[in-house]
């Protein structure tokens, strides 16, 4: 098998510069993915009414809950491929590629079937408002039909990121993003398809991005080449992906579960609050993706350096990623805080909806950097091969805390503000425990390296 290129080497050179160059296209890609959702929300809110806006928005937490397990497996593929790449294990990289793509297709089909047939029942469990549940069900069913393509893109983009390539997935999303916006306008304004048109535009554009990124892997030479004729599961690669990815997916699912519970509580305030919350959440997503690019950089850089046994780089990776995520989080969060009212008017002209969205942004935006710190510390742990620890910490620090909060504090002080404040509290507590765990793991790995050096002497 042809030798791997060193173009994606993340183990040497100026680390901060490499992290920024890696993260910028990744952040841009995430922004484009958010523009898919923003285009949905803006077009629907402007041209189909607040009921349609609430129908689309009420699906967000549920969709995340159902897909995050497989997104976690995509992260597992990223960690395993990056570690093999850092160790210059060509065979390991190739087997990871073949296995990851196969898992994405199997998982995507599974999610499509489950999501399509369970859509209405799941929305009922979430107490979706009666005036929007039929529209929400229609949107959700169409969305899940495209799930195989969504999963295929996520896995393939993760594989490319593992070897330092964040630019070409950006191009794929840029093309798909233009298609999504055009189709949104055509389906909703011209053909009056409302939420069905929005969902259809989304899955068609995601199909384009999935096909494009798959072609990139097929055209790769050497270890990263995707051989579509020999797709299959390699046991060792699958077990490693599951070992890292399953806990990561469960962690994301835990967060989504708590968000579903909070969304259910928000639904109880009616469609106006649901619509405002949807618009604000969409705006906050832009802050999150700006930070999350550095969290994803942390896991890829850490994984490659662990594979190359360059433990001396791990502290630099952690410090630089934490610095970047804090600066970006504060800058974007404060910008959204002060410009919230203007930004929300892009989503709706209904002043009651804008006011409802503003009440959320005023609480969450300035503290959002805590979420970035939490994710970056968890990524550093996963990159070092410890994925169960952040899962357990998140289970207790986020899901359990938020559930207890809703069952106690929210019952005593029933308001949207009481719900929203649970987010920054859980971020701060979870980040603190992640940091303690990371320091313990860091000491363990350094002691192990010293022992190996002593034995080799």
Features from the language model and the residues they span:
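Short alpha-helical transmembrane segments in multi-pass integral membrane proteins
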Residues: 1-23, 81-146, 179, 190-246, ...
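Alpha-helical transmembrane segments of multi-pass membrane transport proteins
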Residues: 17, 32-33, 70-71, 111, ...
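Helix-terminus/linker motif at the lipid-water interface of multi-pass membrane proteins
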Residues: 31, 35-54, 123-130, 186-193, ...
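Small-residue-rich hydrophobic transmembrane alpha-helices
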Residues: 53-113, 150-169, 263, 276-340, ...
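Short runs within selected transmembrane alpha-helices of multi-pass transporters and secretion channels
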Residues: 74, 142-161, 169-177, 198-213, ...
């Amino acid at each position: 098998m042809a030798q791997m290129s060193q173009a994606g080497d993340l183990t040497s050179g100026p680390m901060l510069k490499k992290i920024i160059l890696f993260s910028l296209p990744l952040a841009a890609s995430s922004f484009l993915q958010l523009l898919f959702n923003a285009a949905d929300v803006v077009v629907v809110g402007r041209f189909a009414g607040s009921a349609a806006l609430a129908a689309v928005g009420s699906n967000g937490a549920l969709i995340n809950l159902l897909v995050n397990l497989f997104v976690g497996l995509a992260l597992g593929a990223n960690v395993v491929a990056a570690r093999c790449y850092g160790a210059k294990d060509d065979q390991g990289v190739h087997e990871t590629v073949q296995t990851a793509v196969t898992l994405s297709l199997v998982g995507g089909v599974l999610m499509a079937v489950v999501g399509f047939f369970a859509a209405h029942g799941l929305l009922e469990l979430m107490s979706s408002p009666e005036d929007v549940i039929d529209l929400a069900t229609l949107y959700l069913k169409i969305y899940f039909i495209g799930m195989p393509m969504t999963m295929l893109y996520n896995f393939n983009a993760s594989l490319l990121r593992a070897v330092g390539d964040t630019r070409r997935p950006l191009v794929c999303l840029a093309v798909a993003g233009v298609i999504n916006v055009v189709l949104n306008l055509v389906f909703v304004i011209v053909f009056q398809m409302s939420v069905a048109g929005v969902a259809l535009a989304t899955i068609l554009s995601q199909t384009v991005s999935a096909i494009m990124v798959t072609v990139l892997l097929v055209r790769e030479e050497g270890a990263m080449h995707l051989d579509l004729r020999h797709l299959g599961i390699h046991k060792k690669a699958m077990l490693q992906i599951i070992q890292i990815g399953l806990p990561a997916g469960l962690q994301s699912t835990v967060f989504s579960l708590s968000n579903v519970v909070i969304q259910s509580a928000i639904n109880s305030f009616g469609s106006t609050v649901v619509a405002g919350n949807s618009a604000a959440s969409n705006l906050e997503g832009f802050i999150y993706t700006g930070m999350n690019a550095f969290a994803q950089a942390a896991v890829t850089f850490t994984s490659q350096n662990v594979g190359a046994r360059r433990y001396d780089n791990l502290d630099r990776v952690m410090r630089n990623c934490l610095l970047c995520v804090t600066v970006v989080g504060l800058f974007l969060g404060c910008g959204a805080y002060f410009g919230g009212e203007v930004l929300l008017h892009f989503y709706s002209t209904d002043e009651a909806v804008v006011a409802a969205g503003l009440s959320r942004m005023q609480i969450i935006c300035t503290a959002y950097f805590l979420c970035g710190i939490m994710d970056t510390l968890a990524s550093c742990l996963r990159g070092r091969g410890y994925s169960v620890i952040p899962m357990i910490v998140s289970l207790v620090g986020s899901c359990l805390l938020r559930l207890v909060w809703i069952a106690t504090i929210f019952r005593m002080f029933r308001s949207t503000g009481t719900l929203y404040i649970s987010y920054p509290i859980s971020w701060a507590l979870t980040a603190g425990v992640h940091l303690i765990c990371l320091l313990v793991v860091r000491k363990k790995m350094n002691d192990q390296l010293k022992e190996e050096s002593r034995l080799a002497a």
